[in-house]
Amino acid sequence: MDADKITEKLGITMSQMQRAAAAAIIQGSGNVEVLSPTGSGKTLAYLLPLAQLIDAKSDELQAVVIVPGRELAIQSAEVLASLKAGVRGYACHGGRSAMDEHRELRKLMPHVVFATPGRLNDHLDKANIDPSGVRWTVIDEFDKCLQMGFADEMNHAMERMPKTARRIFLSATNMADDGRANGELSPVGFHIVDFLENSDDHKDRVKINIVNSPDKDKLRTLANLLACLGDESTIVFLNYRDSVERTADFLRSEGFSLTAYHGGLDQSQREEAIYRFANGSANILISTNLGSRGLDIPNVRNIVHYHLPETEEDYTHRVGRTARWDKTGKTYFILSEGETLPDYVDATTCDFEFPENLPKPAKSRMTTLYIGKGKKDKVSKGDILGFLCKTGGLKGAEIGRIDVYDYYAYAAVDNRKLNFVLKNVQGCKIKGKRTKVEEMR
């Protein structure tokens, strides 16, 4: 399907960078490197042209996308599915059985595989993935992949791809002079789509606020700030896992709607945390820097630096979570006595002033329902939407994101209607099958 038709159907307006990248991939015949700031939409920049170029009638694997983490693999597969172009995608990553993935790969026969380096090599070693028909090999977040030490694994995987396959690297940093970008990872001779100089445009769309804390322990100042931000979607960044848990526990005790995210959680816990934040069931995400890369969550209004970022790169990727796709956003530095703004924050700042009467913590706009039937039960998004409207008594505007998995589904509903809808659907059937419906805990 033509990329322009896909965007028109979905109501998407491609940015200048995305158009330039798409043109280089569709019209060119060589390798392409896309350099563009965090939050500028690089995932769509390569998926839209691939959706046009891939032969959806074939059952061959035609593209392999290497990503640095499981969250980006999952999200990228979801983005491809949302394009509704008939192109099948599948995410392969650690944290689950490779044997289960092999069964799914054989059944689905994806056109595109999104994979972390280690899991990709595992499947290649076991011949679970046949790369012979691959026409495109993509490395998304190329800079982060190198920084995380995946160079050897990526080189090994790339060596096993057909020599005729075109290569597409996407990065928020120019890694041409990085010694790790060698061998199969060298971008020498690539057509460069460089929009890094436009990063100042993103800075102009982010307002920087200084929040002074009278205490070294900033928890009370943070709580007061979040109360002022109301139900706006906000990410609070800290540098340590223990600090995330401590902060989350305190804010929950204060009545805030939040979820916590860090590398110490297992895969299902991390996925649930991001899901609740993305669908509006939690206003606040408390996160380590793990949440500053690989997460594409629209409409994040505020970034709060509870701990100062340790490097300029950390700062860039934190702030890149807001003001995405030409939107505006705000970032807040909470500074205790003796702390100063890092030198690399060179924009104009404002001092945040608290009102005399602080508002109470805002409730979340949405709540997530767990529905105990899924794809294996022949239940679709449309079935769930109809069930919640006809049986649950909800209006369409009171229902948010719906996601259907193999054996269950999630649906976001207006928080004010939670008890109403649960009462209406208890004991009722969906597509003739009695099912459990309850609030996600």
Where are these regions (language model features)?
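Non-catalytic terminal extensions of ATP-dependent helicases
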Residues: 34, 253, 354-441
